[in-house]
Amino acid sequence: MTGYELESDYGSMFDGTNKNCKESILELQFTNSTADGTFHKHVLHFWVAPGSMSGWDEIRVSDMMYNEFLKEGRIAEGNMYDARAYGSMMFDDPYYYEGGHILGYNYDDIYDENSATRYNYRKYMPSTWSDYAQNYVGTNMPLMRYANVLLMKAEVYNEQGHPEKAIPLINEVRSVHGKLPAMTGSDQAAVKAQIEHERLVEFTLENSRFYDLRRWGKLDEAMKADGRTGFSASTHSFLPIPLMEIQTNNEINE
């Protein structure tokens, strides 16, 4: 695939400042403008924001997700965690103590010892408080990014028994988006584990996790770990075939 590149500022793809960038292959289009008489806005920013920001605190960063973001430690440029952590969530870190990195505010302006959680998603919040404070916002939602192409290609190479071809693709995403050094490990199992980690931190809140887990055969394990005991991968992995299709096509076997 040509004509696309990874965007160096990961968070800008989700805060409305870098719509339809060089990495974007397909994204849902929203706008704050109502000049044409139409309304193309959403309220996802309120779903992810904590109550202290007048948010609904409904879509939270899980403990698992938080730990995954920080699991490699401060190995990124500037002695930071994976840069995607800062583009995806607000958490207790010196980066957020000053400089107004939370829509012009600092960590202690948003959280105190009584906060229900000490971390929330930053992804899909607009870049400024004035935009955030609107009831509806016009930030776009990426559906397919070039990073996904690279990591899918890496996964294919690895499944074909060529981890050496997958590693440079993984490292490209790590370097540009995470500001991270090259991955460690070189065998097929290590590369598979790295791909699973990269996809989790790269595409959080981008609707890929269910399909990744299904492809890897890990849906039951993940759902049970989250307390979803009523889930069964054999029953719930795919949507049912519409009855009309079954009735009109004798070749369909339920």
Residue ranges and their predicted role:
Residues 1-40, 76-254:
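Acidic/polar-rich alpha-helix caps and helix-coil junctions
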Residues 44-66, 109-113:
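Short, cationic low-complexity segments
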Residues 49, 58, 68-71, 131, ...:
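Intrinsic disorder/low-complexity segments enriched in polar/charged and small flexible residues
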Residues 61-62, 70, 242:
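Residue-level signal for threonine
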Residues 65-73, 149-151:
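Active-site-proximal alpha-helical segments within enzyme catalytic domains
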